[in-house]
A protein has these predicted regions:
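Ordered alpha/beta subdomains of enzyme catalytic regions
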Residues: 1-114
């Protein structure tokens, strides 16, 4: 049996920058888009779930406040950028991320909608 060695991003269990809680391919895609001139291109991303949990028959729209807070506070620390550099992200992309702040629009169902 082959074992897989999983290296944590940061060994500090108390470090919790949500910007770094993502699939790594999202960073590689963003770096590629940046390098190919798409830095200022408007793009759309969706936050959704595929099915109701526990075979439930309905869903309630909730959590928009937390999502807005996440988007407004989205940033990368020096620690994050140093790590991303070790994973091959370009210097230009890392410079961009160092000052990145979300400035998009958010469309959502009204909180509490069934």
């Amino acid at each position: 049996m082959t074992s897989i060695n999983v290296e944590p991003y940061i060994s500090d269990e108390d470090y919790d920058n949500p910007a770094m809680v993502t699939d790594f391919y999202e960073f590689t895609m963003a770096n590629c888009l940046f390098l190919h001139g798409y830095k200022d291109t408007v793009m759309v991303f969706d936050m959704f779930f595929r099915t109701n949990p526990d075979n439930g028959g309905y869903s309630i729209s909730a959590g928009q406040h937390q999502l807005v807070k996440f988007l407004r506070e989205y940033h990368f620390t020096e620690r994050d950028l140093k790590y991303l550099k070790t994973k091959g992200m370009s210097d230009e992309f890392l410079e961009y991320l160092s000052t990145y702040r979300w400035k998009g629009d958010m469309y959502a169902l009204k909180e509490g909608t069934v």
